[in-house]
Amino acid sequence: MVGVIFGEWLLPSVFSSIHDHRHRVVRLKRMLKQRGLLATSGVGFMMCSFVAGLGQSAAAPTPILVELFTSEGCSSCPPADALLQKLDALQPVPGARLIVLSEHVDYWDQEGWKDQYSSHELTNRQKSYVSELGLATAYTPQLIVDGNVELHANDPQQVQSAFEKALKDAKIPISLDSVNFEGPEEAATVRGHLQVDAGSENHNADIYIAVALNHAESQVLRGENQGQTLTHVAVVQEMVKVGKVQKKGNFSQDFEVKLKPGTKPGEVRIVAFVQERGSGKVVAAASVLQNQPGTGIASR
């Protein structure tokens, strides 16, 4: 049993009424259907707000990848963004290292506020999960844990169960080394070396590198979150496939990822993960914080 405390550490939940959200849900369902993200009509949404605080951090050897699909245009997302920040900072799961990624989708951008961190590629990534996990629809805020467990980001019991499941799954070794930034800020590149040891296990998996902002903040001027200052953690700027692991094989290779213009090396983290094709299961993950140009701080 994972020692995640969702009791006295849980701050009072803030649930918006069904009446207040009904018009929003209907509009979002129509929007998602038009964009091909709603697989089945008539499926309801659970998008309730909550604020969660978790227990104290603990040393953790097992990496768990936690992806949050979110948007600054969604009024149910700020509490989930806050939860992700707490998971990252407090590391409340003994025996685990939570590696978080905030992935901003773009299907809310037509609803009054364009999220500056949104990406159609990340929308497509969420859509792939809808297919792989047999879901009816994409929605926000949604958590994906280790690529094969999906849950509403406002349900602490589901979050706890997902971490319990993830801790039972063995991971293969992965390492990020010699991570450095090169070039001017307006056209910087991150380079490093990635090694994956699949050992004797059979795998058919893709290897990804994600570059994410450690911290981001926005003043929202329109839309459902109008007037709010929103903060985020590990906001994905780039996510690229750099290789693959097949059958009983290892991977050892240098990688290179071009950063978005203006991205400062001291403001990002580099995340590497190995994801099985078909099932989406994440079998390896690692992260490096980049506190200053040319200096990688290993394994967060």
Predicted ranges, named:
Residues 56-139:
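Active-site-proximal cofactor/substrate-binding loop regions of enzyme domains
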Residues 40-52:
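Bacterial N-terminal signal peptides
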Residues 12, 51, 77-80:
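General secretory precursor processing signal
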Residues 55-56, 300:
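Basic/polar N-terminal segments that are highly enriched at the extreme N-terminus
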Residues 8, 47, 73-76:
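The N-terminal extracellular segments of secreted preproproteins, especially immediately downstream
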Residues 33-38, 143:
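N-terminal export leaders
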Residues 1-34:
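N-terminal secretory signal peptides that target proteins for export/translocation
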Residues 114-142, 146-300:
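Short, conserved sequence motifs used for protein processing/export or organelle targeting and
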